[in-house]
């Protein structure tokens, strides 16, 4: 049962092809589905492929609450530095490639796991001084960029050949906001020979996985109902509270709801469900010596949920 007013509200896991921007994918989805309210979760470079989840209708209001962790498979190419940190850029330096054993590589990659600081590349969409970095890059201007905290959970070597030491295939699990091209660049700087990213595939974005994605061509042939994921499924990582039927009118008005005794954290996001259906998301607040859930995003739902 879909509690929302429109059947075309939820999340779609799109398989972005190389050669399209994330904006292109959203624009095409708008035309196919005839839905204006569409937003994507996490830009993919035009040359990259893989998982690009999009939100439809009211689900666009929930994008910020979707898990942001990502998984990638990437090609690392040694011996070059480019102005874009990937294979599409202009080569600015070339260096001899060192000979490393697989064991030496595994030890080196351990240095790039865990919490660290990363400086976004000039070709990214990060805003500095009111402009996107890629806008500066197009003008040939390099500006100082503030570093960002990221987390690399895992780096595994998928493919390595001693007779071709200039190329590795890596699997990376990381936090949202991590730039794989910059990770490749930093590895090259650590080795002193430079490195760039070749191809890139995003295999997972939050709960969305490559094997469950659909292509734009499939979407053109008709939206399969099982491909539309409900907001409640996507936000399963958030704690849940059940709303009593008599409190539904108060919820619609955005009034705070009493939370059962628990060690809540101020500002913690909570799913607000009725009969297992997501109707709103709120935040825990401490007020009048008790915990309340203050609705922040109340969805418009069909009255059929009361039947």
From Swiss-Prot:
Keywords: Isomerase, tRNA processing. It comes from the Bacteria. It catalyses: uridine(55) in tRNA = pseudouridine(55) in tRNA. The active site is at residue 45. Its EC number is 5.4.99.25. InterPro entries: PsdUridine_synth_cat_dom_sf, PsdUridine_synth_N, tRNA_psdUridine_synth_TruB, TruB_C. Belongs to the pseudouridine synthase TruB family. Type 1 subfamily. Responsible for synthesis of pseudouridine from uracil-55 in the psi GC loop of transfer RNAs. This is tRNA pseudouridine synthase B. The gene is truB.
């Amino acid at each position: 049962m879909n509690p929302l007013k429109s059947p075309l509200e939820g999340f779609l896991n799109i398989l972005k092809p190389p050669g399209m921007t994330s904006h292109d994918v959203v624009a095409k989805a708008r035309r196919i589905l005839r839905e204006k309210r569409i937003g994507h979760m996490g830009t993919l470079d035009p040359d990259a492929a893989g998982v690009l989840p999009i939100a439809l209708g009211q689900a666009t209001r929930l994008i910020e609450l979707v898990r942001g962790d990502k998984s990638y498979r990437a090609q690392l190419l040694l011996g070059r530095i480019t102005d874009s940190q990937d294979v599409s850029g202009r080569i600015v330096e070339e260096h001899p490639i060192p000979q490393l054993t697989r064991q030496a590589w595994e030890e080196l990659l351990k240095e790039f796991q865990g919490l660290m600081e990363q400086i976004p590349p000039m070709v990214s969409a990060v805003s500095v001084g009111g402009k996107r970095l890629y806008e500066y890059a197009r003008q040939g201007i390099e500006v100082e960029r503030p570093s960002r905290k990221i987390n690399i959970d895992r780096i595994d070597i998928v493919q390595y050949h001693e007779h071709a030491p200039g190329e590795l295939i890596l699997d990376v699990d990381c936090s949202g906001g991590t730039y794989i091209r910059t990770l490749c660049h930093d590895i090259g700087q650590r080795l002193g020979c430079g490195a760039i990213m070749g191809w890139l595939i995003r295999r997972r974005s939050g709960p969305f996985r490559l094997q469950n994605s659909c292509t734009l061509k499939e979407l053109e042939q008709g939206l399969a109902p099982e491909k539309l994921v409900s907001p409640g499924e996507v936000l399963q990582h958030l704690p849940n509270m059940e709303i009593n039927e008599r409190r539904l009118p108060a919820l619609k008005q955005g009034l705070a709801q009493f939370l059962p005794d628990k060690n809540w954290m101020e500002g913690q996001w909570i799913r607000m469900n009725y009969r297992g259906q997501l109707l709103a998301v709120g935040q825990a607040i401490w007020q009048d010596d008790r915990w309340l859930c203050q609705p922040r995003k109340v969805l418009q739902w069909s009255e059929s949920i009361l039947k």
